[in-house]
Amino acid sequence: PAVRRTALRIADGRLAEVGDKVKLAYRQNVVSAVLAERASKPVVVVALGDSITEGATATRGSNGDWPALLSARLQQACPDQVVVVNAGISGNKVMDHGRSHSALARLDRDVIALPNVDRVILFEGINDIRHDGGTPPVAGRNAEDMVLGYRQIAERLHSNGIRPIAATITPFGGSDRYEPIAAAN
């Protein structure tokens, strides 16, 4: 997936700015997670989703993705008590592999394997119901398929002591990616 963070720390600890004459790369190899022990045990929330969760439409480097905004609000309300992990990947689907492994396939690696996860906000599905990109258009998943996928995720999370929270799929009628064949399902 594309890296949408450009923040870089320089020697004095502040965030790098363009004027610092530091080359800021927009696509780069990154460490996917850094785990640190702490004295208190915060509530760990994983945001599992697609490009909406990843922050594909946020201004690059702004931390304008919804998990970062949620994290900032929670830090204001209850400092150091909640950690939000962004596990969004552009193009991700609940059931089928797209640009990446499906949410079902990556659930163990990206959520369950993380230590002390308490809750998961699942914001996935718009890519499943859109057509598959073929010509002629082929319908994506239907409502029954989606419910089955969501149930499988919920059951796996519950069996690991993690509370799932489902977000509503956003409407997409009128967007440049709207497909009547997908909306009919």
Q: Where are the language model's segments positioned?
A:
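N-terminal secretory targeting modules
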Residues: 1-48, 54-60, 79, 183
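Short hydrophobic segments within beta-strands
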Residues: 48-49, 87, 167
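Alpha-helical cap/lid subdomain in secreted, periplasmic
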Residues: 61, 72, 76-80, 98-185
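Active-site metal-binding loops of divalent metal-dependent hydrolases
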Residues: 50-52, 89, 126
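Short connector loops at secondary-structure junctions
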Residues: 79-95
